[in-house]
Regions:
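Active-site-adjacent "subsite" loops/lids of carbohydrate-active enzymes
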Residues: 2-5, 11, 17, 27-87, ...
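Substrate-binding cleft of secreted/luminal carbohydrate-active enzymes
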Residues: 183-209, 224-304
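Beta-strand-rich modules
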Residues: 369-399
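Aromatic-lined substrate-binding rim segments of carbohydrate-active enzymes
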Residues: 1-31, 119-146
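Active-site neighborhood of glycoside hydrolase catalytic domains
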Residues: 72-82, 86-172, 176-226
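Conserved aromatic anchor
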Residues: 322-336
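Proline-enriched interdomain boundary motifs that mark the N-terminal boundary
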Residues: 307-316
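Extracellular low-complexity, O-glycosylation-prone stalks/linkers
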Residues: 334-357
Length: 410
């Protein structure tokens, strides 16, 4: 820690490159305030910010946190985010649920001196929320100043507020909530357009007596303010002895079936990826063969940009028997960079606009933004097909369809 690797390599650059090679997006996941995970056990370099600016930090439990009420500490975090967006081609900045820390029974977060210095006329609860609001606004602004295409997302704890505290809250009985305990007013951030998506951590099961998956799923679907929602699934729980319902092979499939009843819920995120190494409950096979059997495009965010890339350029189209071969190049005109191409396959003679939004029609997603050569079969097992290609821009907006049978001159 505190020293560059020898021989030098950049882990973040490596991760982004390998992610993009696979047609995936890279969302840089950050904890906004947590600075030292376990006091006495975490190895901290001499030049670490906690050593250089100890007055910026507060000790709570066995962890050290940036003081959310310290403006210099806030600016440091904002500058880190700005640096990432400026120097690396990330697709999004993603904040974890740790804003003010989860409460420890019998211990008050030690920010009384910071509150007194602030001179705020707000009560301490509202002052804490205003501190978190301030850093969210500043991070959002910094991201968009550096690159308007980079998104800003939050992965909040499952409950914004319980209904017994606020009629806008969810039908839940969470012991701690975003608004009242972590001082994270997620709904405000969505409403004010400070963030682009939320990934609520719905890590408990269907029918839970206090925080039921199905109730929170419906609540978040109604409170997105037009932004994207990706549901967080707690698949790690299959390995917990006390999580009996997560040992049921039907739990995750049932969650996905419920999720897909809400058109404004765009997808899922799983915590954590290492759980899939064990193929829990056979879910790897179930997901691959049933729920995710077709390729999918990341949904575009219209409030960022609706601009389409120009259509791809096809050349050297040739037919030999039932095989058609051709070359694809990125468009030579237009201001929208291309990240990939999509090849669609339709039954010959079918009206394509009725099928374009069905993932089963995606033949392949080709992550070669500089172009590629391709050969396709126009007839297989007696069925005839027609192919079309689109270019996909950085905000996941597709170009117009180009039929493969037509040669588009450069």
């Amino acid at each position: 820690q505190g020293k560059a690797p020898v021989p030098f390599w950049d882990p973040l650059a490596f991760m982004i490159e390998e992610t993009h090679k696979r047609g995936m997006e890279f969302h840089a996941w950050l904890n906004p305030y947590r600075a030292v995970h376990t006091i006495g056990k975490s190895s901290i370099a001499a030049e670490h910010i906690t050593k250089r600016k100890p007055e910026w930090f507060l000790l709570y439990g066995d962890k050290k946190y940036f003081d959310p009420g310290n403006k210099d500490a806030q600016q440091f975090v904002v500058n880190v985010v700005r640096d990432i967006v400026k120097r690396y081609p990330v697709d999004a900045i993603h904040m974890d649920d740790y804003f003010y820390p989860y409460r420890i029974a019998g211990k008050e977060f030690p920010d009384a001196a910071s509150y007194a210095r602030s001179g705020s006329t707000l009560n301490k609860e509202d002052w804490r929320r205003s501190n978190v609001d301030s850093i969210i606004v500043a991070i959002s602004k910094a991201i968009k100043e550096e690159n308007k295409q980079v998104r800003f997302g939050i992965s909040p704890f499952s409950v914004w507020r319980n209904q017994d505290k606020d009629p806008r809250g969810s039908d839940s009985r969470a012991g701690q909530t975003n608004y009242d305990d972590l001082y994270a007013d997620i709904l405000l951030w969505l409403e004010k357009d400070w963030i682009d998506y939320v990934t609520p951590q719905l890590y408990l099961e269907i029918g839970h007596d206090k925080i039921a998956y199905e109730k929170l799923l419906e609540w978040w679907s109604k409170n997105a303010f037009g932004k994207h929602i990706y549901i967080g699934h707690g698949i790690y729980r299959f390995d917990e002895r006390t999580s009996v319902k997560w040992k049921n092979p039907a739990e995750l499939p049932n969650q996905l079936k419920l999720l897909r009843q809400y058109p404004n819920v765009q997808g899922s995120i799983y915590f954590s990826s290492k759980s899939f190494d064990k193929n829990p409950n056979g879910w790897n096979d179930s997901l691959q063969n049933n729920y995710y059997k077709y390729p999918a495009l990341v949904p575009s965010m219209d409030w960022i940009s609706k601009e389409k890339p120009a259509a791809p350029v096809l050349s050297r189209v040739a037919k030999k028997g039932e095989e058609i071969s051709f070359s694809v190049k990125p468009p030579s005109a237009g201001n929208v960079p291309v990240k990939c191409f999509v090849i669609y396959r339709f039954p010959a003679g079918r009206f394509i606009t009725t099928l374009i939004n069905q993932p089963a029609t995606i033949f392949s997603i080709v992550v070669k933004p500089n172009g590629f050569d391709q050969a396709l079969q126009q007839r297989e097992k007696g069925d005839a097909y027609q192919y079309y290609i689109t270019a996909v821009g950085m905000n996941n907006v597709e170009s117009d369809l180009v039929p493969v049978t037509t040669v588009v001159k450069e």
